[in-house]
Amino acid sequence: MCATCPCAADPPPAAPAGSRRLTLGQALLQRNDQQAAALRRRFQQAGLPVLNLISSPGSGKTALLERLGAEMGQRNLRLAVIVGDLATDRDARRLAAAGVEAVPISTGQACHLEAAMVARALERLPLPLERLDLLVIENVGNLVCPAAFDLGESLRVVLLSVCEGEDKPLKYPASFHSADLVLLGKSDLAGVVGFDRAQALAHLEAVAPGAAVREVSARSGAGLEALLEWLLHPREPRQEWEWRGWRGAGMRGTAKGAEG
């Protein structure tokens, strides 16, 4: 974990009698929440849906966004992606080669994106927010720390590759509990790897009962058209994000109006 994550800190020693303790992790999260709220107002004023895409490394986030960008391009819709990685801009260059407006963020040793990083990346977007149809924040590959940090998104999306197994929601409950939408990716490989769909759905229902679930495949394109329709025209009106925070118990609130 990185030095800025609350989960990286050792338990503090007992405080002397009569003293006050300021938990730096809490202060960091509070500052991030304030910056995220400002971003959310900015996105709402632009009428722009924004996704925070979270997954394990290698789950297929970038490949999925390449195909989603192609699908949107056929409809004359504009997609932009802010790409978070510890090092290199390889994924951003992949997306740019596919015709997607992409801005990289290299976090160094930080295992997640923060609202301030996103705000700085917005200044490097070649198009104003008002001219975009969808903005995706591709978070650093990690199912732990990103769950704690609000980025001003209107929807939080967790991608679970079928190659990772059915038990990921049980092992990493905070990320899945925080999701408005869970994507079962690489769905064309489910039979090959013996993915138990019913068991995965049961785990998701236990951990993330308010999340919508969609199956997609970047390789075959299956589910992408339906996914795009859902993102741009959800069945229920999205409510304003209710951020209750990810404090202590490792759980956070979601926009319940985004259920499918």
Where in the sequence are the language-model features?
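Nucleotide-state-sensitive switch-loop elements of NTP-binding domains
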Residues: A14-R41, Q45-I54, S59, A63, ...
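A short, charged, Gly/Pro-tolerant segment at domain boundaries
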Residues: W241-G260
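Conserved C-terminal guanine-recognition region of P-loop GTPase G domains, centered on the G4
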Residues: P146-S154, L159-G210
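Hydrophobic residues at beta-strand termini and immediately following loops
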Residues: C5, I105, R214-V216
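Long, basic/Gly/Ser/Thr-rich N-terminal segments
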Residues: M1-P16
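Canonical P-loop GTPase G-domain recognition
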Residues: L189-R244
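G-domain G4 guanine-recognition motif of GTPases
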Residues: S56-P57, I82, L86, V140, ...
